[in-house]
């Protein structure tokens, strides 16, 4: 396939007008045209890399934690229709027994239709009961390396991220023991600055949904956010225009740099569906517009109802983030953070030919997966 007349998002994080060649499912810049080759005229549209979501829980009425293959496939199909072509869905805080079932379904899943399942984000149970958010406090426990390794084996090596509250007893030891096996993210935490610094020194390198479920910044208690800034951690942002004020989103890009910001959806099963009553991790959730909250605790946000592509679009169109920065934060950075950037997150030669064509307002015109048009809205 040749995509002609596109404004291509280059590996240098700029746009360049030209043609994009895909051969055998992968980007092949400079390859000579073939007789009878399919040509897709972009007519000047943006050509963006397929997005990579490393933290979301579900969509279209299905939750990853349902441990249901049909549900997982429905999620993958929906995400692909929204330009998200690689997914690393998140578990919730559950017992090992419940997590086993989730890992079994993920390990058995076969890519080939919809977004590729490239990992699992283990959000809990190694978190703080004092910053529980929408997680279930019943299953919170100390970090357990043996348990993690059993789950990792069960998943077939799919676990790419493990969330940890470093201030909880024994959790720093877990970080030291396991950081060479999986990306460790500080999350759902009451940690102070010094303990966060110790966690990064021990091998943590990531922050889950920055600003949410963690101490904020003050001039006398800088907390984990300043520790993350000083140690060059990757930081997740939910840019649904509910979780974080636009000024704070811009502040984060300006301080951490667009090479360390990762946009996530943190979406739950209501994503792609109307307002109503849903669930997340076994807890009742009410969705009105873009806002999802625990039904019994309406001041507690329970994930988002917005897909990653729309979060990226809002970051640009509603929050003032430069397009080049937002695209990087939704493609290359998440792929790199979980170690799948040799295949996903970029339009560099050799990567999968995953392309989203979008107009000037970032409306999706077409989605190309490995050189095949899978959605065409032109």
Which residues fall in each region the model found?
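His/Asp/Glu-enriched, well-ordered alpha-helical/loop segment
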Residues: 224-235, 253-265, 271-351, 355-357
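Active-site core of metal-dependent hydrolases
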Residues: 153-273
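Conserved, mostly hydrophobic/aromatic
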Residues: 44, 122, 178, 207, ...
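C-terminal cap of metal-dependent C-N hydrolases
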Residues: 6, 336, 346-378
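Histidine-rich, glycine-flanked metal-binding segment
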Residues: 1-48
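Active-site gating loops and adjacent loop-to-helix segments of metal-dependent hydrolytic enzymes
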Residues: 77-88, 128-156, 200-210, 221-234, ...
């Amino acid at each position: 396939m040749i995509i002609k007349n596109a404004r291509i998002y280059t590996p240098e994080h700029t746009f360049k007008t030209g043609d994009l060649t895909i051969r055998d499912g992968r980007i092949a810049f400079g390859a000579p045209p073939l007789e009878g080759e399919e040509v897709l005229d972009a007519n000047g549209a943006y050509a963006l890399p397929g997005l990579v979501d490393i933290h979301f829980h579900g969509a279209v009425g299905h939750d990853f934690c349902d441990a249901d293959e049909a549900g997982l496939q429905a999620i993958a199909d929906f995400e692909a229709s929204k330009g998200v072509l690689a997914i690393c869905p998140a578990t919730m805080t559950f017992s090992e027994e419940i997590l086993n079932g989730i890992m079994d379904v993920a390990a058995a899943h076969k890519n080939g239709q919809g977004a590729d399942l490239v990992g699992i984000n283990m959000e809990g149970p190694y978190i703080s009961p004092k910053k529980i958010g929408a997680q279930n406090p019943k299953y919170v426990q100390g970090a357990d390396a043996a348990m993690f390794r059993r789950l990792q084996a069960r998943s077939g090596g799919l676990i790419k991220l493990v969330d940890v509250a470093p201030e909880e007893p024994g959790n720093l030891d877990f970080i030291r023991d396991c950081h060479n096996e999986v990306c460790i993210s500080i999350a759902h935490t009451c940690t102070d600055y010094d303990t966060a610094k110790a966690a990064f020194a021990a091998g943590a390198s990531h922050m889950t949904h920055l600003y949410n479920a963690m101490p904020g910044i003050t001039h006398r208690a800088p907390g984990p956010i300043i520790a993350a800034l000083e140690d060059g951690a990757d930081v997740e942002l939910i840019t649904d225009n509910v979780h974080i004020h636009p000024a704070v989103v811009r502040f984060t890009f300006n301080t951490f740099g667009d090479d360390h910001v990762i946009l996530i959806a943190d979406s739950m099963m209501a994503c792609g569906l109307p307002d109503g009553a849903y669930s997340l991790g076994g807890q009742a959730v009410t969705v009105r517009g873009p806002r999802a909250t625990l039904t019994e605790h309406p001041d507690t946000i329970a994930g988002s109802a917005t897909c990653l592509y729309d979060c990226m679009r809002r970051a640009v169109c509603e929050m003032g983030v430069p397009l080049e920065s937002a695209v990087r934060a939704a493609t290359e950075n998440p792929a790199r953070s979980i170690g799948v950037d040799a295949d996903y997150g970029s339009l560099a030669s050799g990567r999968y030919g995953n392309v989203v064509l979008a107009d000037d307002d970032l409306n999706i015109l077409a989605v190309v997966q490995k050189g095949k048009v899978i959605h065409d809205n032109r």
